[in-house]
């Protein structure tokens, strides 16, 4: 259902997509184009700032492995990309913000999800690269592995790093504004490129706000 009404029998309705929201996003892309900005669009974004957001229909489901959830995610992704693929402000598609944090899964389930979403994007738009969008990729398969670096390099076109020392193994050693941490982003991104064999870039970086560092320390780190 969309609000309190059944899904309309339209291409967007059959994908569970509200046309009003599509037009709002389209207007947003036009504003970006007007002011000379470009967009990397994270499509499946349920995980934000340590909290999980998902539709009521997905409550109790593992959104990375449940076939019902993946079916509707693929429908949504195809409809979203199909509607917006002609917007020049969009330079790349991103699977979504740190989707490997959305649920517990095996590396096999994560590969299957990533491949399904990437394939859905490519069915509608093969002209733009697909960015992984994940956080903390693993080099080796571990118990409840978040996501394998090699698997993301296989299923997407571009890898990205979110180099927060607090959430990276063996990196919470020095103060945020010291020399070793200053090289964290560059070293991790270079590692992704060398191991994955695809381009990589720093997608997020920062000091995690006043809970971890003062404004003075944060300015020193980012400056």
Label every model-predicted segment:
Residues 221-223:
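Active-site-adjacent alpha-helix of alpha/beta-hydrolase-fold enzymes
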Residues 198:
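Short glycine/Trp-rich loop-beta-loop segment that forms part of the substrate-binding cleft
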Residues 1-163, 167-170, 176, 180-182, ...:
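Active-site mouth of glycoside hydrolases
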Residues 133, 201-204:
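Active-site neighborhood of phospho(di)ester-bond hydrolases with catalytic His/Asp-centered motifs
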């Amino acid at each position: 259902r969309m609000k309190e009404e059944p899904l309309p029998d339209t291409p967007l309705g059959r994908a569970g997509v509200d046309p009003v929201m599509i037009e709002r996003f389209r207007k947003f892309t036009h504003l970006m184009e007007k002011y000379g900005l470009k967009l990397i669009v994270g499509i499946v974004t349920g995980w934000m700032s340590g909290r999980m957001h998902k539709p009521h229909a997905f409550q109790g489901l593992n959104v990375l492995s449940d076939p019902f959830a993946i079916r509707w995610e693929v429908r949504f992704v195809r409809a979203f990309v199909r509607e917006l693929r002609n917007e020049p402000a969009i330079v790349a598609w991103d699977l979504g913000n740190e989707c490997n944090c959305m649920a517990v899964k095996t590396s096999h389930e994560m590969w299957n999800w990533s491949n399904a979403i990437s394939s859905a994007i490519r069915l509608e738009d093969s002209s733009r690269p697909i960015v992984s969008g994940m956080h903390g990729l693993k080099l080796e398969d571990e118990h409840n592995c978040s996501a394998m670096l090699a698997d993301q390099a296989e299923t997407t076109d571009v890898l990205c790093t979110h180099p927060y020392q607090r959430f990276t193994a063996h990196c919470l050693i020095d103060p945020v504004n010291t020399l070793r941490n200053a090289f964290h982003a560059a070293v991790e991104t270079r590692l992704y490129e060398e191991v994955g064999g695809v381009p990589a870039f720093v997608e997020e970086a920062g000091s995690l706000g006043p809970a971890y560092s003062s404004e003075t320390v944060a300015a020193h780190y980012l400056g």
